Amino acid sequence: MPQHLSGPRVVVAVAATAPAQVFAPNPVADLGIQTLTDQKDADFFSADPVLRRAYHRVTLTDLTSPAALSGAFVAVKSETGPAAANTGSGFIFTRDQDQFEQVMAYYWITQAQRYIQSLGFGSTLPAVNRRQVGVRINQFGGDNSFFRDTKTDITLGKGGVDDAEDAEVIVHEYGHSVQDAQVSGFGTSADAGAIGEGFGDYLAVAVSSAVAPTPDEACVADWDSTSYTVTVPHCLRRVDGTKRYPEDLASPREVHADGEIWSRALWDIRQALGARLADTIIIRAQFRFTPAISMPAAAKQTIATAALYGKPAQKAVTAAFAARGLA
């Protein structure tokens, strides 16, 4: 059952709520069934007593109105189907309906922002990405998702498993929005681009673990990746790989592959310090970054941020980056 992220540090800008149905974070991770496939968006879940457990009833929060998917932190627009509207019983849809993906995008971006706020950002620490982000469900069959800093919006693709059916794809893209809010234009070098991809993967794992923990947390996008991977478990990428800097950089450079160096360092920080302290340090450090920062320089700034939390934290963060060749 997804955990409702709340607490005294969460800033609630608007009060409207509504019932909804989502995957948490996705059927493969949730049910532990690696043989699930897309089947052209068919809803084969509802009629099966085991598979129907992949659907979770949740409460959408921070809505401007309980009638539509627009709120304090996200506004959803569909370009390939009718816009989701409250049916009277809430936003209860199944995966064969385009509206299900819209609900997923709204819920998981809101949960990501609420998690960040629960760490103190916006209260005891500067706010991070506390703005309304637009989300477009379109791409007309393209299996790709991306964040555009020029428009401050996220586009989620519909090729293969529709990207918005996997919470970790949604939150990964939100990670780019987070970094753009902290450092305008972030990601203008190969290293900075890799940091962006690595952080997106890590944030996806961090948020999904906070809301709906699963056994294999280090596997990113278990459901979306069933359309383009043959190995089991199915993962877009993992955050517990073995790559080091600079010997394992891709040639030519490829930010997603190189991002696995950064995400592993963040994962090790999490294992050493625990989720909440690690995530606070990781996110807070990004205020010190520059648009074209190198991985070693970003590691140095993260270590400096960790020092604010005491010598044990600084030592653990230094060790995590040293293991990746970054300190």
Q: What are the functions of these language-model segments?
A:
Residues 1-170, 177-327:
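Zymogen propeptides/activation segments of proteases
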